[in-house]
């Protein structure tokens, strides 16, 4: 702890954000990094706690508290305060393969568990992480380090999202020969097509993938395992196979009129925008994407993906945006039964919601509401949506609280475009069937508790395909742990340290 009184001397300083009305004019990241001197002062705010909850990564009441990767947050905060940015990078990389991703898209579980935030503002650890990794690229610390000795073992990774990339990176460093198969045209999975450009500019994915290629990893795109290439041939060619295909099967909304033209899954909407931008020099060309321009948009789902749909719709030039959320509004401050260091279950306004409020003059969200019916015109196009209010009721059989319709509360709103962001149900069935792996009741690939090997010999799994829809940081952790288990199965021992 370089400055014992740092948390008292310095206030938290956030990276300045471009104003909502200005940033919706482009698809670039919109936060301006602090200067190195300012960021060093932010590092001084870290209290170097005897028990640093920020790196605990524990589940409390079903929610994560602290970093699942067990990032050495107090260490690299102290190092940047002392100006030792290179060593800070090495301490960061010890636990996190991809800080260039997490420092942009992670909800900062570390900050929610920060002791400094118990009675004040948390240490800006996410921004510190961003500065460490970007400085490392600028100074050359993050350059490729090719492996010098190979084991002769070959591993296939199916899927190039964060878990697949983490598995590949760890096993390649160990000396195994790794090939990553991706069904899309570019590497990245969720990072590439599930997260909009203004949250994660795609050149940062390419920057890291290029380094991984220099280090010896082979990437094969436009190859859909289970369709374009048979599972049997993969198993014959490789010593081990890791399934990291994500939880890509979207949850649908079953309501009358669902077949109306103008209803899309959120991931298809976001993906079409990203592809159109990169095909046309970061400009949207009419007819090349699912457009919200001039339309009344309804987003179904109150999570991060729903917010991304709002932000993307605002950049398209939507006429109006309404976000429909089934659950009640969370409290503005922690409830007594939600104490620190639990994840704070409070109402938060994210960037897309902030942008819609700035343009339209009101919060786009409506709570305790769901779709009753999609209404079509004579041509089959969506023109309106009937919504209905909900209330929590206790199920007498299970004891669980369920959201039930309130009779007589139906109302109709205009809608030209509906985006379904209601989460994901699990992995793609054709992949699991191709390899013959068992799935659980949630259609996630089944493994013994705390392990990553499936019921099929030599086949492993990790990430959302294994644990269900989750955060990038959890996917990276699963990839690291799976790599360690795979290494043991190949070599009989491991020298990997994944925590």
Regions found by a protein language model. Name each.
Residues 5-32, 41-44, 57, 68-82, ...:
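Beta1-alpha1 glycine-rich phosphate/pyrophosphate-binding loop at the start
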Residues 12-34, 42-45, 367-369, 375, ...:
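C-terminal catalytic lobe of FAD-dependent flavoproteins
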Residues 306-309, 316, 462-493:
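A conserved FAD-binding loop/helix module that cradles the flavin
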Residues 87, 149, 154-158, 206-256, ...:
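Feature captures the FAD/FMN-dependent oxidoreductase FAD-binding
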Residues 261-294, 393-469:
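FAD-site-proximal beta/loop scaffold in flavoenzymes
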Residues 46-49, 54-58, 63, 67, ...:
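Short cysteine clusters
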Residues 25-38, 64-65, 69-104, 108, ...:
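Ferredoxin-type iron-sulfur electron-transfer modules in oxidoreductases and energy-metabolism complexes
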Residues 131-149, 207-228, 250-316, 439-455:
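Glycine-rich dinucleotide-binding loop and its adjacent helix/turn
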